[in-house]
Amino acid sequence: MPASRPTVFREPTFARGDSPMAQYDVFPNPSHSAADGVPYVVVIQSDLLDALSTRLTMPLAKLDAAIKVPTALCPGIVVKGKRLHALAHYAAPLPAKNLRRAVDNVSAQASVLESAMDAVMSRV
């Protein structure tokens, strides 16, 4: 039986155009047709999964103040000084190559995003 070779850790490789991005980085919405109402998306995927070609994102929407939203699912998030609502129930993977340049990082607001995902998964 041949001797096994030791496992060697290798840095993740990224598809052309992909790059590592931090959890809670905020990017312009790559869907130009939806960008008026949903100007940004936030990466909620763990940095441990950077080698994947997609990123789990949560849309950040402009909502009229008169519209009542369930705050457990749609918490308010401040991005570049503007209040938006995270739409946890619309979280979806996007190709990493479509997320070009981060405009903000909302890691200081991570707990409300995590609570919103928890509400989607276990409290709705």
What residue ranges belong to the model's regions?
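Compact nucleic-acid interaction/catalytic patches
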Residues: V26, A34-G76
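Onset of an N-terminal alpha helix
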Residues: P20-M21, A34, A110
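C-terminal terminal-subdomain/extension
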Residues: I77-V124
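Short coil-to-beta transition motif at edge beta-strands of beta-rich domains
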Residues: S19-N29
